[in-house]
Amino acid sequence: MSSFDLKQRAVEWFSNLGIPTQIATFVWICVPIVVLILGITLGVLVLVWLERKISAAVQQRIGPEYAGPLGTIQALADGLKLILKEDIIPSRADKWLFALGPAIVVIPVLLSFLVIPFNHQLIVADISIGMFFWIAVSSVAPVGLLVAGYGSNNKYAFLGGLRAAAQSISYEIPLALCVLSVVLMSNSLSTIEIVEQQSRFGILGWNIWRQPVGFIAFVISALAECERLPFDLPEAEEELVAGYQTEYSGIKFGLFYVASYLNLFASSLFVTILYLGGWSPNISFEQVFNWEQGEQLFAVLDGLIAFAITLSKAYLFLFASILTRWTLPRVRMDQLLDLGWKFLLPVALGNLLLTASFELALL
């Protein structure tokens, strides 16, 4: 790992511009957050475009074509349309709960990106309990769905909110147990240390080889948490019109879709971090060329390559999830709950017990 301290160099650069050190430190805190928000926005736009193109290819269609080159700004046009549409509030709805629901859904998903590392230094909040933080904030989002369904004063919306709550509880527990298995093997809750632990033996050190059962259970639980087909029961159009978002319009309606894609994007990144080695195997230019000069250039190149590797693995998982949407049929609600409680929970619990036994045997 390079000794290049990005924070220190950034503060020094701001100080050289005549900015006091305290203000420069505050600016450094704000810059990664702004960059993260812009990066998340761009990543979601790319994800929406990829899903439309891949879905069109599966169905032997062309997909978005006229909005920009190859339809690349179609998602931006759709977002602008939703922003400009009228925000209608039903007369008998609870106005406070109706407005609060989308915010409760989006904010926890945005917070989960704070602990996602793209490199040793490309992370907003390097806390020692990163995985616990993600599990904690992700469990808040279903409350927003239930609030949105209840506040709409609509039977279809309320049923969709109840389904979302039941589905989240059913799959949050297996998801957390799979994370605990990885944490036991890594001996840390830090996302960076989990990646570093996998990088010791290159590709063979990835947790997907040591936790194959946990990987499968985690992927299924993550897809169910994101309410992706075949687990989109809370918003099944044929049964519930649009589920908990039936009465929503305009920007509030768009926030639910943004939260869905953000959750899918975050889940794919956590799959990469937990099981696919994160940014490893990364190439350190400083070690390869052994040059004493150009330390900053090496650090920038290392960071860019690590960022590209992490995103490549994440979008590979996204590609698989998009194909799954057009491959598998939607399950019934009883089948969904049976899969979570009668299959995934025992499998994830057994995997955790085996992992704990193995780790104790190595002491």
Swiss-Prot record:
GO molecular function list: NADH dehydrogenase activity; oxidoreductase activity, acting on NAD(P)H, quinone or similar compound as acceptor; quinone binding
Matching Pfam families: NADHdh
Annotated catalysed reactions: a plastoquinone + NADH + (n+1) H(+)(in) = a plastoquinol + NAD(+) + n H(+)(out); a plastoquinone + NADPH + (n+1) H(+)(in) = a plastoquinol + NADP(+) + n H(+)(out)
Localization per Swiss-Prot or TrEMBL: Plastid, Chloroplast thylakoid membrane
Keyword terms of this UniProt record: Chloroplast, Membrane, NAD, NADP, Plastid, Plastoquinone, Quinone, Thylakoid, Translocase, Transmembrane, Transmembrane helix
UniProt membrane topology term: Multi-pass membrane protein
Transmembrane segments: 26-46, 96-116, 127-147, 175-195, 203-223, 253-273, 303-323, 343-363
EC numbers: 7.1.1.-
GO term, biological process aspect, one: aerobic respiration
Main localization (coarse): plastid
InterPro entries named in the record: NADH_UbQ_OxRdtase_su1/FPO, NADH_UbQ_OxRdtase_su1_CS
Primary enzyme class: translocase
GO cellular component: chloroplast thylakoid membrane
Subunit (UniProt): NDH is composed of at least 16 different subunits, 5 of which are encoded in the nucleus.
PANTHER family: NADH DEHYDROGENASE SUBUNIT 1, NADH-UBIQUINONE OXIDOREDUCTASE CHAIN 1
Family: Belongs to the complex I subunit 1 family.
The protein's role, per its UniProt record: NDH shuttles electrons from NAD(P)H:plastoquinone, via FMN and iron-sulfur (Fe-S) centers, to quinones in the photosynthetic chain and possibly in a chloroplast respiratory chain. The immediate electron acceptor for the enzyme in this species is believed to be plastoquinone. Couples the redox reaction to proton translocation, and thus conserves the redox energy in a proton gradient.
Name of the featured protein: NAD(P)H-quinone oxidoreductase subunit 1, chloroplastic
Species assigned in the record: Zygnema circumcarinatum (Green alga)
Lineage: Eukaryota, Viridiplantae, Streptophyta, Zygnematophyceae, Zygnematophycidae
